[in-house]
Amino acid sequence: MLNIGFGNRVAAHRVVAIVTPNTSPMKRLKDEAKKAGRLVDATCGRKTRAILVMDSNHVILSAIQADTLAQRYAAVKEKKEEGTHNEPE
């Protein structure tokens, strides 16, 4: 599970992209997801600092910086890989 802030978590294996919300394409993506009912706002009223795109086409807004989420994502993936490669010594 990937912590996206304020007690909210998402399944890390379902994350397709972690992007910054400042660009026009990301603003359009957010607006289209809202119209389609696929937008999840996990900012708790704070400024959106990252957008997560999921494999189900859901778009999740987070108040945590995209770089921070990317580091957390990498740590989760690394921890998972260590757990799956337990070879006897």
Swiss-Prot record:
UniProt-listed InterPro entries: RemA-like
Family: Belongs to the RemA family.
The protein, known as: Putative regulatory protein Dalk_1931
Organism the protein comes from: Desulfatibacillum aliphaticivorans
Lineage of source species: Bacteria, Pseudomonadati, Thermodesulfobacteriota, Desulfobacteria, Desulfobacterales
